Amino acid sequence: MVSLKDSHFDLFHLPAQFALDETALDAAYRTVQTQVHPDRFAAAGDAQKRIAMQWATRANEAYRTLRDPLKRASYLLSLRGVDIGAENNTAMEPAFLMQQMEWREGIEDAAAARNVDALDALLAELRDEKRVRVERLGTLLDSGADQAAAEAVRQLMFIERVASEVGAQIERLET
């Protein structure tokens, strides 16, 4: 029997690795939700309702974490005792720092020129960069290169933030 303290992977009976069968995750999530959905406990006592709600909440949180590659990577690292240090470790390789500056300049220039096409192109570039880096992250995690994976997670977090900023600029210019 799985307990509330078990890992997200244990909850869904999946191996604790980055490479994930999304179809199996979806099916396992539906199975767990069917078992613990609060509606099944409508006639139960308050204690059973509360426990069902805890399990449903836990299943939702676990599913959201495992479904998102960046959250899944961060979670895997935390299970291995590796702190990604996103709040206090901003050191990154020089090539990535240069890329960051180029992206920032691209955002500023395109926003100043009110050039939505340039922002769309930058957003596409960021999505491609994220896809490539997520693949690399999976290789790092599944080979046990946890410190390199932690840096890759920090870089991906930055890329997601920049992509979000680009999306906000596009929305601002289109309204």
Curated annotation (Swiss-Prot):
Residues 7-79 form the J domain. GO terms for molecular function: ATPase activator activity; protein-folding chaperone binding. The keyword Chaperone applies. It comes from the Bacteria. Pfam families: HSCB_C. Signal peptide: none annotated. Keywords: Chaperone. GO terms for biological process: [2Fe-2S] cluster assembly; protein complex oligomerization; protein folding. GO terms for cellular component: iron-sulfur cluster transfer complex. Gene3D superfamilies: DnaJ domain, HscB, C-terminal domain. Belongs to the HscB family. Interacts with HscA and stimulates its ATPase activity. PANTHER family: IRON-SULFUR CLUSTER CO-CHAPERONE PROTEIN HSCB. Co-chaperone involved in the maturation of iron-sulfur cluster-containing proteins. Seems to help targeting proteins to be folded toward HscA. This is Co-chaperone protein HscB homolog. It comes from Burkholderia cenocepacia (strain ATCC BAA-245 / DSM 16553 / LMG 16656 / NCTC 13227 / J2315 / CF5610). The gene is hscB.
